[in-house]
Amino acid sequence: MFKKYFCFSFLIFSASLLITWSAIGQSKMLSKGDAAPVFSAQASLAGSAFDFSLRTALAKGPVVIYFYPSAYTGGCDLEAHTFAELKDKFTAAGATIIGVSADDIQRLNSFSSDPNYCAGKFPVASDPEGKIATTYGLTFTPPKIGIKDVRGQEVTHGFIPRTTFVIDKKGEIVAVFSSEADHISPAEHVEKALAIVKAL
């Protein structure tokens, strides 16, 4: 009798876990008007690792958080390069830029200092398990075998969809756009974000 009860209870528990996990995986992407989840993460600026705090950044002004799939891949390289080119204009608007991907900090140390990409102009943060992305309602895709970056190196981390959140200094999301939903290019992410922070 006890054995049957135990097995039945275990099945119910397992089913509840599956339901909970499914709900987490299908969480809705945050939108305009939502409070931006604060986070801290290991990040890199100009090849040097440091601890980035969204709370600290917001104390200085608006923040542009741009999630991207991977360093050293076509669209992400273009996006980083465009942010670097327009960094002074974001600074003039009082805004902080932070990129977030699942790349490990070693890759980001290289990417953040590469003159062709981030060029030491703004930091990029590591979210290796997609925990930050998940709090923003983004889907974290597990690693895929056989994918290589523009340098020919295998990409072993998971992926976060290209999505940009513009957050005002009160911590409220004032704009969000994604390549998947809005069908915009990596460069357009940057241009739209700049136009919004200028208007704040």
Language-model-derived ranges and their functions:
Residues 9-20:
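Bacterial N-terminal signal peptides
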Residues 1-11:
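Bacterial N-terminal signal peptides that target proteins for export
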Residues 2, 21-24:
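General N-terminal leader/first-domain-start detector
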Residues 23-200:
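Chalcogenol-based redox active-site neighborhoods
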